[in-house]
């Protein structure tokens, strides 16, 4: 049996062994094969990375903005040339099917493209005359060393929200990727190096609690970007703020989709199946709840079950597979416990994800509950799995009232052909990202990922103009010029 490779951290342009003696298996969730082992690093490792990044900041922050942008452009080109390899790594580590993995790679590349626009993004503003012979200018400067804490479910797209923009704007970066998806991160590092990135500008430290706390507490780290669960995100926001750091914390979701009587059912069902069960439901923009008007509910449920019956479950590398595994055994057990809870609390199980699934990996089939109420646990909690709850409602107003009861407010969608309903939905729903006749309202890189309520802690969101503000600080210069005498 071949020896399992132990991964190293990436600090100061080199792969270095962690100070730890603890390693965790990285497992292919579709096969349970151990791919490698990742270090559960220590605060010593973070100290080294932070000092390295702080030293690199002194020179990197002074590199001309067009030069930084050129390196990001080179990185984008290399990512594009290695799409298939990157997608393969996502599939074997995360479990997504190849099509979904390629889609994630594409979104990651879009984020890098946006960051490559740093020369225009870094521009400040000025006013030639604020008083007699006085002018003022507003300049942007990088903030310093930035820490990023990324999740397993989008191992390329989410880190590419973070470090490309931060680095393009003149910061240096320490990434703590998920310990479940490190091989993809290794490839990103390799390609970023080839793009011409200097040593110390980008660093990677694998780990768990000690690494997170090290990032939150280290005095050299000035800002933190986090994506993950609500409990951890709330902790990151509070503790990071206590240490006087700038923090953005993108957390949980319970996204509601509203289906009105006039919706095109074929398109609606296709979109909802993709939104609810794509990526095994392990995404913060997944459709978790459908509220459907009573007049169309029976027909909707029939078409939904018919569509779900055609879903192929299995290894994402296999042809035709739509639904891959959840990430780990614990996640599978947790999902099965929610199915039991839904039954106990009186919901009607119309598609049972416990049936006809392989034990070769951590598989849960598409699960649909009908007759769900807002008192039920499966409505309240973020399940983060291929589980969909359906609630029948009298009208749009009731559907919005139900959605607005949730503590989460990442996204919400509406399927209708009524323009007045669209406007009413837009003005009254409590959610930061809305979709009209589409299932996943995740915005492009040049718009903010704009969660509300318990889906986000902070002021400045990821992506868009918010990300430029998050990773920079401003300096306003006011200057008086004595009136010249050219006579």
Swiss-Prot record:
PANTHER family listed in its UniProt record: MALONATE-SEMIALDEHYDE DEHYDROGENASE
Pfam families the UniProt entry points to: Aldedh
Species annotation: Bacillus subtilis subsp. natto
EC number, UniProt record: 1.2.1.27
HAMAP family: IolA (MF_01670)
Residues noted as binding NAD(+) in the record, renumbered to the chain: 150, 152, 176, 179-180, 229, 251, 382
GO molecular function, one term: malonate-semialdehyde dehydrogenase (acetylating) activity
Pathway recorded for this protein: Polyol metabolism; myo-inositol degradation into acetyl-CoA; acetyl-CoA from myo-inositol: step 7/7
Name of the featured protein: Malonate-semialdehyde dehydrogenase
Active site positions, chain numbering: 284 (nucleophile)
Catalytic activity, reaction form: 3-oxopropanoate + NAD(+) + CoA + H2O = hydrogencarbonate + acetyl-CoA + NADH + H(+); 2-methyl-3-oxopropanoate + NAD(+) + CoA + H2O = propanoyl-CoA + hydrogencarbonate + NADH + H(+)
